[in-house]
Amino acid sequence: MVAQIRIGQGMDVHAFEEGNFVTLAGVQIPHTHGLKAHSDGDVVLHALCDALLGALALGDIGQHFPDTDPEFKGADSRVLLKHVYQLILDRGYHLNNADITVACERPKLAKYNLEMRQSIADVLNVDLNQISIKATTTEKLGFTGRQEGILATATVLISH
């Protein structure tokens, strides 16, 4: 039997607000601001959830965890990711790899890269080498360049 291969792509954006850390890939990173959101505002995990859901045409994160539902107020996005990945597993698929890009001027993320990758690998129970995270800037252009927020994109390859 030929393997069933699916690709998913996701994106998320959150604006900065008052605070002293951001949560990215389940890791709290010190910063001069927090991220405005109904949940913990983890743009990395939200983009990854959308990529996984998109790979099997299962909707998007907002359909599964609406920001109008008080149950998800302040929710830990690792819990959301675990739920989404279980939907993938329940359909007989597994993650081959995830490639994530985070765009922001600040905070600088290089020293948190391994910890962020490991956090995702732990939630999904996959090998570290299946998770890639890259950080970039937008050369001071756009809302991320003006340090108004953070953007993350994720692409996944899953197979059955």
From Swiss-Prot:
Keyword Secreted included in the entry's annotation: no
Catalytic activity: 4-CDP-2-C-methyl-D-erythritol 2-phosphate = 2-C-methyl-D-erythritol 2,4-cyclic diphosphate + CMP
The organism's taxonomic lineage, starting at the top: Bacteria, Pseudomonadati, Pseudomonadota, Gammaproteobacteria, Moraxellales
Gene: ispF
Short name of any one Pfam family annotated for the protein: YgbB
Binding site for 4-CDP-2-C-methyl-D-erythritol 2-phosphate: 12-14, 38-39, 60-62, 65-69, 136-139, 143, 146
Example GO molecular function: 2-C-methyl-D-erythritol 2,4-cyclodiphosphate synthase activity
Pathway linked to the protein: Isoprenoid biosynthesis; isopentenyl diphosphate biosynthesis via DXP pathway; isopentenyl diphosphate from 1-deoxy-D-xylulose 5-phosphate: step 4/6
Protein name: 2-C-methyl-D-erythritol 2,4-cyclodiphosphate synthase
Sequence similarity: Belongs to the IspF family.
Cofactors that this protein relies on: a divalent metal cation
PROSITE patterns noted in UniProt: ISPF
Top-level class of the enzyme under EC nomenclature: lyase
Positions bound to a divalent metal cation: D12, H14, H46
Site (Transition state stabilizer): H38, T137
EC assignment: 4.6.1.12
Subunit structure: Homotrimer.
Family annotation (InterPro entries): MECDP_synthase (IPR003526), MECDP_synthase_CS (IPR020555), MECDP_synthase_sf (IPR036571)
Cofactor stoichiometry and binding remark: Binds 1 divalent metal cation per subunit.
